[in-house]
Regions:
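Helix-loop-helix "hairpin" substructures at the membrane interface of multi-pass membrane proteins
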Residues: 10, 131-212, 235-240
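Alpha-helical transmembrane segments within multi-pass membrane transporters and channels
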Residues: 21, 54-98, 105, 240-245, ...
């Protein structure tokens, strides 16, 4: 039972992170390799707002979420809109450069010391029994529930709202969407804002659980194989891919060797590239581009 809980928590972490990879790629066909740094920036945003709004934890969390949305839109407005119409390689290199810049700025501003935003908020990470002898921490439960809420909201948004339909149209046929009056730059900025928000949310929860330090970026990198396994243009694929990668990682750590933790996601990815290169829910048309 404890293994099942561990898989659910780790799958929620990966799903919440790779949701951003999928959103950006699905809408703008850009592969963002700065997502780990944007995730960590969201965590540092919570650390900053926790100090700024001391004694008001809910206000600090809301401010950190709003800051993540603003940062995502600003990244598109300041950099990524210039990549519209450029080659895939140029856009990917731009996100790599962005990630390096953000990592350096975060070290410069916040230093390298481990921070604990949950303590600054005045909250504790108590654990409780879920039956069968298994336990889950408060942050772990928040991760599972938060991921379910995010994906449910995104599915409803993309299928049932005007802006969601515009995002789908822009992703499927941007030229036709533009001819129909869809403002592509606004849609792309929204995709970056939502992706940074979900990534920042993952970063905030991870920092609340284990502390905030530079190695948080590597978790964002480990979530990338989950997005590829599921298919880069599918939110459902992101969920399934995250569950597969998390299940393999937890089981191999438990039964084989804990040192395999950083290797397992990429072993799963290699196996998927051999068996089904376009991912479980991806399409053959995306294979050449990926």
């Amino acid at each position: 039972m404890q293994l099942a809980v561990n898989i659910a928590v780790l799958a929620s972490i990966y799903a919440l992170i790779c949701c951003g990879y999928v959103l950006i790629y699905r809408v703008s066909r850009v592969l963002s390799l700065a997502h780990g740094e944007l995730m960590m920036l969201g965590a540092y945003g919570l650390y900053a707002t926790a100090s700024l709004f001391s004694g008001h934890p809910l206000l600090a969390v809301a401010a950190a979420g709003g800051l993540a949305l603003a940062v995502g839109a600003a990244v598109y407005a300041a950099l990524m809109w210039r990549m519209t119409g450029e080659s895939v390689l140029a856009a990917v290199l731009a996100t790599i450069a962005l990630g390096i810049l953000l990592r350096g700025l975060m070290v410069l501003v916040f230093g390298t010391q481990t921070q604990y935003p949950l303590r600054d908020l005045g909250w504790t990470n108590a654990s409780f029994d879920v039956g069968g002898g298994a336990r889950i921490s408060a942050v772990g439960a928040a991760l599972v529930l938060g991921t379910a809420l995010v994906y449910g909201s995104l599915f409803a948004f993309l299928r049932g709202t005007r802006w969601g339909l515009r995002m789908r149209a822009a992703g499927q046929n941007p030229l036709l969407a533009a001819q129909r009056g869809v403002r592509l730059h606004g849609i792309y900025a929204l995709a970056w804002a939502l992706a940074t928000f979900t990534g920042g949310m993952a970063g905030m929860l991870l920092a609340s659980d284990a502390g905030l330090e530079g190695t948080l970026v590597t978790i964002g990198l480990k979530a990338f194989p989950a997005a590829l396994v599921g298919g880069l243009d599918s939110l459902l694929g992101a969920l399934v891919g995250s569950l597969i990668v998390a299940g393999a990682e937890v089981l191999l750590i438990h039964y084989v060797d804990p040192l395999l933790s950083d290797v397992v996601p990429f072993l799963v990815l290699l196996a998927m590239l051999v068996l089904r290169p376009w991912g479980l829910f991806g399409s053959r048309e995306e294979l050449d581009r990926v």
